[in-house]
């Protein structure tokens, strides 16, 4: 979990789980995600709501089971992933966090397809997932023991469904088709794209929304760019002269685009800082020592988020007993508070590692967001809009 302010220890009541979905993030060109990413979504009803289709609208209750390589170093090596160096951990994440991660940051769509499981299979799967999250460490191989294979193992062991027994190594973007072919997944929910979006069976990449906003901009202003990517590739200063020419609707579109531009700059900065960190660490030139020490403390302290058994000094098996949970809540809260402090320190230290040109670009986009916001409020006021 990337939010170190969130309560680290949670509970899931299997009785409140309405359905389990196969959640697929579409592929992109990065080596570690060019086959998509397989996850399972627990569709959980809010307290007091009877199990039924309406639970699908309780998006804030849904949890995602996501097998990922637990990387205890800043560098994600594709080679290490191919040879199984990374521990495989079952992360339990809020659905909203996963939607933002894929649709807004990585610009990848998500499909959430119901699995045809009976009540006993659903409840057993939830219990098995809890045990796997609690203490599982496997080896993560991008090719042969990846998220699809791990998800399939969890489905197989959790449901004991014989239709899963003879499935072997497979890629994420092929597993859904196989599950559908064996009558275990209902892909018909994706047939009507608009209805799929409305009912939470699909979460679209923000790329199409950004392009739609850019089309609004192009209708009013004679900009030369035709694709939103080209517009966002401009320097912030090159976009700025257009702002004061925009009407109310176009200004609203510009604000969303500039916020997307800021997200893009932060992603670029993240990659640049990572490369600088790795190069400086290799050269031992001392320029990243402070950030390095903080980051290592964070990595050492964050393992419990994906494997809570680390917090108990015991070699037992199964889920913790009631008295152990009291100890867990205390220790996990202390560890979480430490991570929050370290995260704040790291943010300051990493910003100092930015190249001056990148730092200027981020500052310029932040200024653009502020400028458009003020322009939008002025237009709104001039049009007689309600002032809050």
Feature names for model-found ranges:
Residues 1-14:
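Low-complexity, highly charged intrinsically disordered N-terminal segments
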Residues 1-2, 113, 128-388:
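Activation targets extended, charge/polar-rich intrinsically disordered C-terminal tails
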Residues 16-107, 351-358, 362:
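Glycine-rich catalytic cores of cysteine/serine-nucleophile enzymes that process amide/ester linkages
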Residues 45-49, 120, 156-164:
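Secondary-structure boundary elements
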Residues 75-148:
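N-terminal accessory/precursor segments of enzymes
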């Amino acid at each position: 979990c990337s939010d170190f302010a969130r309560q680290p220890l949670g509970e899931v009541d299997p009785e409140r789980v309405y359905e389990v979905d196969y959640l697929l993030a579409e592929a992109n060109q990065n080596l570690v995600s060019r086959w998509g990413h397989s996850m399972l979504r627990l569709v959980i009803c809010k307290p007091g709501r009877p199990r039924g289709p309406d639970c699908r609208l309780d998006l804030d209750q849904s949890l995602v089971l996501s097998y990922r390589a637990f990387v205890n170093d800043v560098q994600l090596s594709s080679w290490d992933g191919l040879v199984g160096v990374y521990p495989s951990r079952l992360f339990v994440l809020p659905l909203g966090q996963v939607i933002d991660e894929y649709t807004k940051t990585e610009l990848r769509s998500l499909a959430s397809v119901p699995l045809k499981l009976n009540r006993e299979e659903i409840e057993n799967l939830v219990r098995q997932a809890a045990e796997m999250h609690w203490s599982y460490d496997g080896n993560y191989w991008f090719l042969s023991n990846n998220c699809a294979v791990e998800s399939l193992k969890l489905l197989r062991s959790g449901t004991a469904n014989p239709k899963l027994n003879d499935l072997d190594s497979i890629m994420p973007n092929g597993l859904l088709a196989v599950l559908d072919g064996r009558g275990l997944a209902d892909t018909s929910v994706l047939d009507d794209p608009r209805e799929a979006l409305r009912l939470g069976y699909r979460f679209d990449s923000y790329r199409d929304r950004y392009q739609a906003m850019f089309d609004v901009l192009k209708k009013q202003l004679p900009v030369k760019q035709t694709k939103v990517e080209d517009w966002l590739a401009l320097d912030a200063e090159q976009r700025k002269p257009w702002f004061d020419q925009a009407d109310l609707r176009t200004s609203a579109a510009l604000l969303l685009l500039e916020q997307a531009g800021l997200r893009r700059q932060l992603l670029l900065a993240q990659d640049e800082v990572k490369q600088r960190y790795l190069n400086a660490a290799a050269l031992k030139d001392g320029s990243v020592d402070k950030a390095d020490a903080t980051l290592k403390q964070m990595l050492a302290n964050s393992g419990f988020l994906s494997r809570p058994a680390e917090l108990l000094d015991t070699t037992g098996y199964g889920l913790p007993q009631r008295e152990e949970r009291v100890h867990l809540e205390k220790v996990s809260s202390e560890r979480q508070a430490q991570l929050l402090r370290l995260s704040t320190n790291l943010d300051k230290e990493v910003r100092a590692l930015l190249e001056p040109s990148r730092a200027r670009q981020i500052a310029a986009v932040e200024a653009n967001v502020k400028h458009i916001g003020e322009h939008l409020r002025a237009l709104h006021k001039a049009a007689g809009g309600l002032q809050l």
